[in-house]
């Protein structure tokens, strides 16, 4: 199995443009604008927490050596962004169909996020604690969004036009085909050294070298 490809489903190259496309499509309809803002806020908070945890580690060395923890896994979190994105993405795409199909779409989204998280373990990009923390963070954000939608007085507000559906499907497919990974880790490392007290980004190796 191509675990690198599966991991790419949680890469910022795919998730951030796809998230932007989803926000734009929702904003085009007046009835779904509140939905767009609710989702973008929760997705943004999830991403901000992931970035903050990584900056805290790379800039100040704040990690947990016993758990091999260096911050939330962005792939399993942005998949806290896959677990925050894919369940909602698939739920919105299936909004016109039966309740059973919508539930299946959400479950598929969470399963995909979990598989992305597992792929990060297979390719040795994250520890178990980081993947679990990321999945829990992302799942919490998407679950809160879905709970909020149960209270919406207008179920039509979640319906996306067929043109919008086509656009939303094409964006991630094109990005997945590109295979280009976002340099988010190196960018966060540069920011961490700029704002933190360290001369270079703190690493997992540094964490395990610490004497207690």
List the predicted regions and their residue ranges.
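Cytosolic-side transmembrane helix boundary signature
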Residues: 136-163
């Amino acid at each position: 199995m191509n675990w690198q490809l599966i991991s790419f489903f949680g890469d910022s190259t795919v998730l951030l443009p796809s998230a932007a496309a989803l926000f734009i499509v929702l904003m085009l309809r007046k009835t779904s604008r509140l939905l767009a803002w609710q989702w973008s806020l929760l997705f943004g908070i999830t991403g901000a927490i992931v970035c903050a945890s990584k900056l805290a580690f790379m800039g100040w060395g704040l990690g947990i050596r016993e758990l091999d923890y260096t911050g939330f896994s962005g792939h399993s979190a942005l998949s806290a962004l896959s677990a925050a994105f894919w369940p909602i993405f698939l739920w919105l795409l299936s909004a016109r169909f039966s309740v059973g199909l919508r539930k299946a779409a959400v479950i598929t989204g969470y399963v995909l996020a979990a598989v992305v998280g597992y792929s990060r373990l297979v390719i040795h990009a994250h520890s178990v604690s980081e993947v679990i923390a990321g999945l829990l963070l992302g799942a919490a954000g998407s679950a809160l969004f879905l709970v909020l939608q149960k209270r919406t007085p207008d179920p039509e507000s979640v319906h996306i036009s067929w043109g919008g559906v086509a656009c939303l499907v094409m964006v991630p497919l094109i990005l997945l085909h590109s295979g280009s990974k976002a340099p988010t880790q190196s960018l966060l490392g540069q920011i961490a050294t700029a704002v933190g007290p360290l001369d270079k980004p703190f690493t997992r190796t540094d964490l395990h070298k610490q004497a207690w």
